[in-house]
């Protein structure tokens, strides 16, 4: 995992006003309206997307299906280049918006 991932995630999530963080057992989980949309742990960040988007996202570099279910991906970049940062921001913002659906 890129060592800057936690700081980058924090920078993105701070702009999501209704998100709440809960840390336990080495994992920080963010939710909106009590619905989790992202979880950051030692193996990267897991993000809840629409099922079809998650399936497509899992085919991108450094991304795989999450054990949390078919709507979740695990993103564990070795290097946060511009493309990885773009995907991370887009996925987190989408997950945040979709948490109310």
Describe the role of every protein-language-model region.
Residues 1-101:
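Charge-dense, helix-prone N-terminal extensions
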């Amino acid at each position: 995992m890129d060592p800057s991932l936690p700081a980058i995630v924090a920078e993105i999530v701070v702009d999501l006003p209704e998100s709440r963080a809960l840390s336990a057992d080495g994992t920080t989980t963010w939710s909106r309206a009590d619905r989790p949309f992202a979880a950051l742990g030692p193996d990267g960040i897991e993000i809840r997307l629409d099922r079809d988007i998650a399936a497509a996202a899992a085919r991108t570099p450094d991304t795989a299906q999450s054990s949390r279910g078919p709507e979740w991906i695990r993103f564990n970049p070795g290097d946060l280049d511009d493309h990885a940062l773009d995907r991370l921001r887009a996925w987190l913002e989408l997950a945040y918006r979709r948490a109310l659906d």
